[in-house]
Structure formats: structure tokens, C-alpha cells
Amino acid sequence: MVYIARIRKKVKKLIKSIKPVSIIIMGNDFENVEDLKNLIRWIFSIYTKDLKIDPPIVAIDQEGVNVSRIRDINYIPSNYALGKIDKKNISYYAGALTGYELNEIGIRWNLAPVLDTLSNKENFSILERSFSEYVDNVSRNGSSFIMGLQDFGVSATAKHFPGIGSVFEDPHEKLPRDLRNIHSIWNTMKPFIDAINIGVKSIMVSHVLVKEIDQDFPISLSQKSYNLIRKELGYDGILITDSLDMKAISTNYSPNEIAKLAFLGRADILECVDPELAEDIHENMKNINLNNSKREERLIKLYLERKKKFIPPKEIIQIISYNVPKWIRRKEFNPDRDFYIYYAGSTAYMNNIIKRIILKLRELNFSVKEFNENESLNNSQIIIIGKNLHLNGNYIKINEMCKNNECIFINTGIPYDSELLNKKIGYLAAMGDKYENIISSIYSILGLFYHDNF
């Protein structure tokens, strides 16, 4: 599996060289849904017209919240929000809507959902991507999401086996080590076992060295881990590695070692979003016997028939997004006074959301301004939007900013940081960075909408 960059000429050369069985689309590969559809048609034409072979299965990471590659279709606020709602029919609906939307575009494989149990609140790479801190919650909501996705003709992926919610290190940066005992590992493996039992079509193996499974190699390169999945768990679907360009792998193993360990270990698909590394790995695979009829059978099974003919109503996801925020420290602003909005982050996506929100509020005749942190304010009303203050340290600046002002913090992630803020600062957990989550939170702050306490 390779990642498509925007430079089409180089991409075409790469595809012709590697002939990947699957191509993963990333968020910066397209401008909008129509551009994405054209991209998929262009990819298919290379296979069918130039190479005269079957087209690849197109995959994407459409988990919801911050891992939503397609931002202009309906997507869930976050897995964590679904876990807090904790209704199987709602999680099924979220998967069904995602499956319907992806299938309409031509994407038949979603590298979701995350089935990691959030055991460590400092696990920056997982956080709100997880359904819950509790294994059973992850199992029932994850399985429901999978069933919804697959009922609408899109194969799901249970990731990141055997569960990486307890580690501290981010595999994008270094190799994490899971030193837990075997009982704890099997406990957080339960969501994956339940996913196998309901027929999940693929499992993504993680780049974590799990001491009790293999002391020498990370799960993605470990024959012991593949034997565990195939023989002990009896799984016969697709096994795909997490992206091999992550530093957990790419800085510790050569392309030759990656090719041999992963493929001889019996991974079906090697994911790599770095085109140069993908070519290097492919070159080193030429001397490996890749004949595996089982792999071909598993690939074919990724193409699912859509079982459900109805269209999941889109307004339900909007209702969920409007209603999911919860108060931790309830506080309201006077809507007749001026107020400011400050974004304590840096993503272009969120900056655009804030601009959209300010325009909407001004349409409603609210006196609202975007806060400039160089301004010196006193006795002003400030709405602050951000997340994960316990990891980025922004709580220090926010506490200082709010000494002489009335402030309410809207957290778009998981509210692990509420105790770090001064108690006089109001706190509302939006549990998602969607427009609907944030605008409804602001309406609640202005006394126009009601959210329950957390």
C-alpha cells in the first residue's frame, strides 16, 4: 500500500513501478470530494488502461474528529464522544453513515476504527481516537461501528493490535515498549477478539514492542505476533502493518529487514506513506517468495456487498454533534456584552472553523471579536478553544490571561486537563472539533442552548 502525493507525474511512475494492491488517500491529496472522485478515476485508469491489470482497492483513514481525511462529508465528533454516549445503535449509525459516504465516493476500505483502550492519559497519539478508558466500552462501541461500516460495503480495520493505549511513546517518533504483564495485554486485546468474532475484514498491527509477545521485534515485524493472530485467535482476514515510514520502524530497521520480517512474518499488506521508502522496500521484496494464495483470497474479500439499501439520515450526526458537549464547570456569559474568542492552537482547519463561527455569531448580531494574544484586556469575556493542555502546557498562559478576565474554556479533546485551569475558569468539554460541537458549546455559554454536566 502506498500514499498518493499531489505530484501526479511522480505518482504515476511510482504506481507503474510498484503496482500496489491498495492505495491510501491522505487529506492533502485532494481539494474537495469532486477532486477526490477524479483522483480515484485517474488512479484506476493507470491500472486498467496503462498496466492492464485490476485496479487497487482504495483506502483511507476516516476515523472521525482529528483523523478525518475527508472534512467535507459527515463525520463523527470523535470515538471518545461515541464512547461517552455509549449506545450501540448510535455507534452503528456512525459507522453506517461513514460507510455510506465513503462507498459513494469509491472508497471501499476504511483504516478504522481505533480499538485501543485509553489506559494512559498521556498517550498523545491515541487520546480521543479511543472510545474509552474501559475495555468493554471499546468492545461494544467499536464492534457496532465496524458492523455499520461493513453493512454499507466498506471494509473496516481494527487497529492498532494488540492495543497501544497504555504506552507513552508515539510510534511516529520512536519505538514504544509495552512492559505490561500478559494478563493486562490479553485484557486490552478483547476489543480485537470481539471484532474478529463479528467478522472484521482487516486488522492493523502496531509498531510497538510488546515484551510478553516478542522481546526482540515490534508487533508489525514479529512472526510470533502473526502466529498469535492466525493460530491462537483464528483470524483469517487481512493483516496490514501500520505505516512503515514511522520512526519506530524506519530508524531501527533497513528496507531489507522490513521487507523480510514483515512479509515472511505473514503480513498481507505493508503500508508505507513515504514514496521513496516504499520503493526501497519493494526493491528488497523482489528476492522474497511472495506466492501466497491465501493473501489473494483475503484481498478479494475486502470488496463487500452493501447489505443495507437505505441511506443513513445525515441530520442525526449533526444532532449528535450539537448535543455531545458536557459541562465540567458551568458558567455563562452575558450575551449583550462584547466577548472574544481565542484559539489556543495552530491548525489551519480549526482557524477556519473559528472564522466561520465568528461570522455566524455576527450574523446573529453578537458583538464578538477574535482575540489577539498581544492585547491586554481587563474585565472582558473570553471564550478559549483548545485541547490537551496537560500535554502542551498552554494552561499556564491561559491561567495568566484569565486573571483579570471572565473566561470559559472549550476543550475539543478529552477533559484530562480541567484541574490544571483556575477554578474560576468555566470548562465545557466539546469532545470534538466539528463546527457543530463548537457552535453549540458557544450557544450554551451564551445561555441559548443546554448541555448536561459531565
Question: Language-model segments: what does each one mean?
Answer:
Residues 34-45, 87-106:
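Active-site-adjacent structural elements in enzyme catalytic domains
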Residues 25, 112, 205, 272, ...:
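Conserved beta-strand positions
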Residues 1-19, 252-454:
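Preference for extracellular/luminal or secreted protein segments
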Residues 21, 108-109, 201-202, 268, ...:
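Short acidic/polar active-site loop segments enriched in Thr and Asp
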Residues 74-87, 130-132:
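A charged helix-plus-loop insertion that forms the helical arch/lid used to bind
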Residues 3-6, 58-68, 108-118, 158-164, ...:
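Short glycine-enriched loops at secondary-structure junctions
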Residues 13-26, 96-109:
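Catalytic domains of carbohydrate-active enzymes, especially glycoside hydrolases
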Residues 2, 7-10, 30-52, 67-68, ...:
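Second-shell residues forming the walls of enzyme active-site clefts
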